[in-house]
Amino acid sequence: IEAQKAEPSAYDIINRAVFYVSRMISSQKGREFVNSNYNDIKRVYSIWICMNMSQNCMNYIHFTQESVVGTYQWKGDIDLANIVLIGLAEDLPEKEERYELHRLLGALLSAKLNVDEKFDIIGNEFDIPLESDIRKDVNDMCNLSQGIKEQAYVEGTENGIAIGKQEGI
C-alpha cells in the first residue's frame, strides 16, 4: 500500500504500479517457489491511494485473457498481478454507499478534519471500535499534520518577509 499526496506528474502511476507487482512476483523465486515450479507463485496486490484528485475514483487493473484466433484456453493463473488505484478528492464525499471506502480513507487522511470529526466518522458511520490505542494513533496523526501545517505557515511567513525586505516593500 502506498499513499501519494497527489497523482505524480513525473511518471505515469500505472507504470510504477506494474513495476512494483512485477518485482513482487519475481522476488518470490527461491522463497515461495524454486526451480521451475511457477504454479507456486502467490498472488500480489499493489494498492495506491492518491489524494487531492479531481474526483473520487477507484480502478482495478489486472491481466485478462482474450482469444484472438481460435478458442483455446491457456492454463495458468491470470489473477497473479493486481493493482488497485484509489483516488480521493480534496473534499470528503457525502455519506453514500458507493463512496464508503473514499469517505473512510478521506476522513483518516484529511488535513481539514479535526480529531473529533474523524472519530465521529470512523466510530459512528463505520462502527469501528475506537479503543484507546487507535484513538492515540489517530490523534498523533492529526497532531503531526497540524504540526506540519503550522511549520509550513511559519516558514512561508518568514520567506515572505525576507522577500519583502529584499524588494523594499
Give residue ranges: language-model regions.
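Elongated, amphipathic alpha-helical interaction scaffolds
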Residues: 2-169
